[in-house]
Amino acid sequence: RIGIDIGSSTTKIVAFEGEHMLPPMAVKADSQVASLYGAFGRYLYENNLQLLDVEGVYITGVGSKYVEKAVYDRPTYKVDEFVATGTGGYYLTDKKEVIVISMGTGSFFVKVTENEMKHLGGVGLGGGTICGLSSIILNTGDIHEIVPLSRKGDVAKIDLRIGDLAKEKLPGLNLDVTASNFGKADAQSKPEDIAAGIVHMVIENICQAGILASRNTGIKDYILIGGLTKFFECRQIIEDFKSLWDVTIPEYSDYATAIGAVIAPDAEKEEI
């Protein structure tokens, strides 16, 4: 059984032999359909699989809407992205109830318990925001250039923090908490500091939005998945939240949605 998450920029693929998951793979392509078929063929080749070995293909993600026929004539099913994300995130944790925060081109939040799955909403912040703002300000939209550049920067030179406004911490707010993203930035700010500010702003506000969206659920455990979670710099920012909330980035976090497409309940799978 093969799960494929066709994203806006990257296609991710996993396979299960029984309960055993084979190593996942990610493929980039300009065309989402080309990315799907390229990922599928390459995955079969690298894992010594034959087409007839494929019991079913389970596709999800924004690009799945472009797939209108069975993949290489194998049984093919579409799975709602929210369902796939919630299912995959839940599979990667040992918690009984969690909030799954998906951090991709944009971001959304799913509440998952043993008996319920609910989409809580989302925000228009993610990798697309980082690339778009950086294209305008830093003249590069390549996230593999932006994120390492941010490592060299100092976000304290860009963001205004509580400590810049108050001598003592406020109730529930430490002095290093952000008061205003880019509140210190000016025309002389260095590119590496700006990059740090952009990355920090996006990651921080996705996490904050996810926490606010889940406020009435009573759930305090958060699972972060999606493409942004694989970057070391993003993981460093997320570490700051661990003192306040139980935030986990599981192994294979960027493949959770592809995993969920395979293991989602049969009732959530629509055959093409």
What do the PLM-derived regions correspond to, one by one?
Residues 171-221:
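Adenine-nucleotide phosphate-binding core of ATP-dependent small-molecule kinases
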Residues 87-92, 130-135, 247-272:
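Glycine-rich phosphate-binding/hydrolytic loop that grips phosphoryl groups
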Residues 1-38, 42, 117:
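Short glycine-rich, Thr/Ser-proximal phosphate-binding strand/loop in the N-terminal lobe
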Residues 67-101, 106-116, 259-265:
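Conserved phosphate-binding catalytic cores of ATP/NTP-utilizing and phosphoryl-transfer enzymes
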Residues 75-82, 238-260:
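Conserved phosphate-binding/catalytic loops in two-lobed NTP-binding clefts
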Residues 59-65, 212-241, 253-254:
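Glycine-rich phosphate-binding loops at beta-strand->alpha-helix junctions
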Residues 90, 114-171:
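Glycine-rich phosphate-binding loop plus the immediately following alpha-helix
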Residues 25-29, 40, 45-81, 117-119:
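Short beta-strand-loop/turn "lid" adjacent to the catalytic site in phosphate-handling enzymes
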